């Protein structure tokens, strides 16, 4: 142990870099696990949509009009928080949220889960992942 302390004393830059890298890896892994708990691949979202899931688009009205998942409703993250009473009838149904890249969807699905929505999910990768799979969009 004494030799390890001596080594770090002589190689402070190397030791600091190792500690920073360990922290970066820990944060990355933590975020990955947190996102994957309630994140679904596009094919899984299609399956839930076929079972009658409620789909919520978190993007702007303009982006929504440019193309969205079939049957999706447009709501902002703030509207979801305020609309908990309106969405209450969907608490037991699958509910999928998405945005352009999946980042806002993670937060929204967590907020919904905290409000008692037991089947709230995020589209992993957002609309970008949906498009990458060449899945259809509805315009208007």
Residues covered by each model-derived region:
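Rhodanese-like catalytic fold shared by cysteine-dependent sulfurtransferases
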Residues: 1-39, 48-51, 61, 65-94, ...
């Amino acid at each position: 142990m004494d030799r390890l302390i001596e080594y770090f004393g002589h190689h402070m830059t190397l030791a600091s870099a190792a500690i920073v890298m360990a922290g970066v890896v820990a944060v990355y892994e933590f975020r990955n696990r947190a996102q994957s708990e309630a994140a679904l691949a596009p094919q899984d979202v299609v399956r839930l949509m076929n079972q009658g899931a409620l789909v919520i688009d978190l993007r702007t009205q303009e982006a929504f009009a440019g193309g969205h998942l079939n049957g999706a409703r447009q709501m902002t993250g703030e509207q979801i928080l305020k609309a908990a009473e309106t969405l209450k009838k969907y608490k037991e149904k699958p509910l999928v949220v998405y945005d352009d890249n999946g980042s806002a969807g993670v937060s929204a699905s967590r907020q919904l889960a905290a409000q008692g929505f037991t089947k709230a999910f995020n589209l992993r990768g957002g609309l970008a992942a949906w498009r990458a799979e060449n899945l259809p969009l509805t315009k208007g």
